[in-house]
């Protein structure tokens, strides 16, 4: 990529460092979209031994780019996101991608399409891990930062995304168990 163009796209991507997500970190501050994407990518790398048939490079790229559209729209929590929100993010991302040079433009467009369709192993792994990372982060945050509907989300969110994999289902089950322990502990403290 030409140097000036690289700096331009990096500047846009840098915005994700300042885009807050709904969830809090264990240190008590709002998590950024960049932090979520970073840990999602680590998760993909660290579970790759469970999926030797998956294209790890493609999976890592999916994880790295999956929320770039939020540099333009901010993060809208999944339980608030509407079809209109999704369309706006997709439109702005498509406009931005159109300005990329080849081969990055075509590769990223193909990756986004594959991620949306979720037919390939890599796309299914990415989406499952994306959901799981959010659940894990909620378990790591102070439960007093949870809103009421998150108690139910911690039990159900992502179940459909992990169903294709015994390993990811086991990970989801353990995350759910951690959520139950956290909720039970809060109940004990409030007595």
Predicted regions and their residues:
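Active-site helical microenvironments for divalent-metal-assisted chemistry
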Residues: 1-191
């Amino acid at each position: 990529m030409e140097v000036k163009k690289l700096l331009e796209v990096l500047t846009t991507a840098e915005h994700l460092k300042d885009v807050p997500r709904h969830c809090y970190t264990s240190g008590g501050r709002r998590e950024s979209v960049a932090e979520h994407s970073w840990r999602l990518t680590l998760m993909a790398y660290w579970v790759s031994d469970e999926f030797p048939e998956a294209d790890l490079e493609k999976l890592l790229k999916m994880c790295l780019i999956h929320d770039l559209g939020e540099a333009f729209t901010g993060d809208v929590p999944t339980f608030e996101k509407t079809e209109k929100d999704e369309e706006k993010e997709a439109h702005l991302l498509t406009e931005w991608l159109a300005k990329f040079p080849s081969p990055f433009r075509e590769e990223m467009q193909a990756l986004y399409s594959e991620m949306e369709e979720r037919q390939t192993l890599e796309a299914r792994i990415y989406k499952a891990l994306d959901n799981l990372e959010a659940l894990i982060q909620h378990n790591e945050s102070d439960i007093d930062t949870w809103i009421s509907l998150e108690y139910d989300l911690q039990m159900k969110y992502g179940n459909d995304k992990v169903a294709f994999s015994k390993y990811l289902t086991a990970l989801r089950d353990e995350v759910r168990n951690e959520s139950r322990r956290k909720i039970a502990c809060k109940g004990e403290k409030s007595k």
